[in-house]
Amino acid sequence: MHAIEEIKQLTETINEHNHSYYVEDSPSVPDAEYDRLINRLKQLEGENPHLCLPTSPTQRVGGMALAKFDQITHLKPMLSLDNVFSEEEFEAFYKRISDKTSEAPTFCCEPKLDGLAVSILYRDGVYERAATRGDGTTGEDISENVRTILSIPLKLRGDNFPPLLEVRGEVIMPKKAFDALNDRARAKGEKLFVNPRNAAAGSLRQLDSKITASRALGFYAYALGVVEPETWALADTHYDQLMQLRAWGFPVSAEVKQCGDVSSVVAYYTDIMTRRDSLDYEIDGVVIKVDSIEHQGQLGFVAKAPRWATAFKFPAQEEVTLLEGVDFQVGRTGAVTPVARLKPVFVGGVTVSNATLHNADEIARLGVKVGDTVIVRRAGDVIPQIVAIVADKRPDDAREIEFPDTCPVCNSMVERVEGEAVARCTGGLFCEAQRKEAIKHFASRKALDIDGMGDKVVEQLIDKELVESPADLFKLTASAITMLDRMGMKSATNLVAAIEVAKTTTFSRFLYGLGIREVGEATAANLANYFKTLDKLKAADAESFIKVDDVGTIVAQHLTHFFAQPHNLEVVDKLIEAGVNWPEIEEVAEESLSLKGQTWVLTGTLTQLNRNDAKARLQALGAKVAGSVSKNTDCLVAGEAAGSKLTKAQDLGVKVIDEEALLQLLSDSE
């Protein structure tokens, strides 16, 4: 037998044995025979390295360590799920969706795995890449690490699969693997992982994939992502699509079940919760999805979650501990939040020493005092909070919790706006606590987008008193930046250059970067297009602000308060003096808004026009620029390497133009 033929045969045979062992939990050969096969394959590949196949099981051991993870933009956003915490909340969810479907919905239920969500892409049935969920739009490229997970197929089984297939699922660390990992760490005197989820996340995000390969991670598929061509015939229920994934070689939870009505869903939830501790992986609830793909389409999505699915979370775990004190933290928007200092207690898999008390109203509602014995809960198994006090254990020397009248950071007055529960520092950018978060926000990707200006850099700049306001960023020199940890002259020079580039921005990004409460990207764009100039916006009153699209009385109040603060105006003026600028937004008559009422989408790489500039100029002509193609899209601008959005636009009959046509349109409109 020729070497290539034997390599192919061994690769296929060993992958089948791996599937039997890691996916079906049914070993098909003795360990000695498996070892003989794998050693023979290694020998042949060593003698013929040019014949090694990308699907070879020997490629799962990990490769060269990376300097950092690259970013991957998901072909379709990876959305999160809304939660329900009781049978009553689930019944309300059911009523909401049943009113919107053509017939009573049925469900597909599965355990809510407590791991890390990932997207895996296959092209022509062969593993190509994998990414973390990230912010839902962009994730980290963890392709080499995911390749090491033995339960994930490198080549799909069978031959009836689409040319391009995206699979979504959860990477987990089984409880046995977690215990073994901590046993090894304990023997070496190393720090232990607190729970399997943290261990899975830490293992998957190792820059050295060899470390990931040693961690015995597992994977369960829970959904299809992008499938191309879109006309590819798929099952018409979520359950049957999961069974198709299983047939292609993916692990799918054995606990997946179809449920016909509310009572059967609740019974499933109760059963899984009862058996929770006996499962080999950590879960924190069950996921309930409308089973019919047609019904899913009828229900659609809200901003960041599908309407047709929800996570039915288990009751949060609670413990009793002592409230030893209360600290007050100040956030980017000036919110003063009381944080309870607790006698450390193990709750829901982690040691908790702090818990939120939210605000003064919550403190009053609980009637809590320093020195009280309190009940701590991890709400949704994530955020620790105090839910009650044990009144009969209150000591005689228990002390009232006094909310500060002045900011604990800058001593500015603390005020509480009528109708709001949150108290806020009025120091604005003068306040160091707000300053750190404000400068991080100002430099962020959606604001001035200063490349290399990460959170740790900002914190060091402020701690070393090199920067006090956003305007000070533009005074930084390379020699000053080298004072920061891990900043050599080359990195410092690059950062100074990036700051210089960021001086030229857009009015809307500048406004967004100021961090005015409740002024997001869309509102900032509306304000920029309405007022056109900074001077006009600064001179506006609440009545003028309310005339802007999507600006109500509360946002108008935040705007007037911000521009009424002398220190905020001083920062804005210093930014302009430092050279921050943007293209002038010309006055446009209503009849000149040639794209008013239209929805446009940008896709692919634009070579002559910055994407943000293109978006701003389209908005200046009255267009709404959306992130995805639908039947309501009026036009798609397709740059180089346009992908699934272009295909969808063509299928829907949406008008498509290239970058040259866009430039011509913008030129004709000026």
Swiss-Prot record:
Binding-site residues, Zn(2+): 407, 410, 425, 431
Domain BRCT per the UniProt entry, residue ranges: 590-670
Positions annotated as active site in the UniProt record: 112
GO molecular function, one term: DNA ligase (NAD+) activity
PROSITE patterns named in the record: BRCT, DNA_LIGASE_N2
Stored InterPro entries: BRCT_dom, BRCT_dom_sf, DisA/LigA_HHH, DNA_ligase, DNA_ligase_CS, DNAligase_adenylation, DNAligase_N, NA-bd_OB-fold
Catalytic EC class: ligase
Record EC number: 6.5.1.2
Annotated Pfam families: BRCT, DNA_ligase_aden, DNA_ligase_OB, DNA_ligase_ZBD, HHH_2, HHH_5
Protein function: DNA ligase that catalyzes the formation of phosphodiester linkages between 5'-phosphoryl and 3'-hydroxyl groups in double-stranded DNA using NAD as a coenzyme and as the energy source for the reaction. It is essential for DNA replication and repair of damaged DNA.
Family: Belongs to the NAD-dependent DNA ligase family. LigA subfamily.
Protein name: DNA ligase
